[in-house]
Amino acid sequence: MVNHTMSTPTTSSNTQKLIIVGNGMVGHHFAEQLVESGALAEFEVTMFGEERHRAYDRVHLSEYFSGRDAESLALCNADYYHTHGIQLRSGEAVTAIDREQQLVVTEQGHYAYDQLVLATGSFPFVPPIPGNDSEGCLVYRTLDDLDAIQAAAKNATNGVVVGGGLLGLEAANALRGLNLDTAVVLYLLRAKRALT
């Protein structure tokens, strides 16, 4: 493992090292607010994104199946972060945080910080049912997930979506658009909780 540990968090008396963990919609919005408010001058900013794509619009994710690509879904142009002096580390997941030493840990190394923002977003709920780890059981959350769904649909005739929330219905519509006979199943425990 390459060690990128900095000996001290602060870069100079005028700037602080700010690490943003998460390059989704919230992490990107936070970075935009730093830029727009002029506060960026106070920080040396590094942003970690687990995904290989920079921040994109998850609300319109289903449009990926009808021709939009990662670039057209992106929340900013390819040069945005570089132009504003933000170091974006796409495809580099944070695996641990050492609060005592003020370090963020990834598979590539350790990164010191003075200030830390956690904007990790959410993860899809996968019901604890038999078969939930089968090859054809996929989640609908990221562009890579959609690539996997599209690939699986080429050899399928039916699709089942577990969950009838916004993303579940978007996923069902996407499966229909991929010419699959599609059913939506509500997960009973979650539905029961919603009714009580």
Kindly give the residue locations of the regions a language model identified.
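Surface-exposed, flexible loop/turn segments at secondary-structure boundaries
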Residues: H53, P124-F125, D145, L167, ...
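Short, conserved glycine- and acidic-residue-centered signature motifs
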Residues: V139-T142, G168, T196
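Short secondary-structure capping/turn micro-motifs that flank functional sites
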Residues: I97-D98, E170, A191
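Beta1-alpha1 glycine-rich phosphate/pyrophosphate-binding loop at the start
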Residues: S7-Q87, A174-L195
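FAD-binding core/adjacent interface of flavoenzyme oxidoreductases
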Residues: V2-I19, C76-V162, A183
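N-terminal Rossmann-fold NAD(P) dinucleotide-binding loop
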Residues: G27, G168-L169
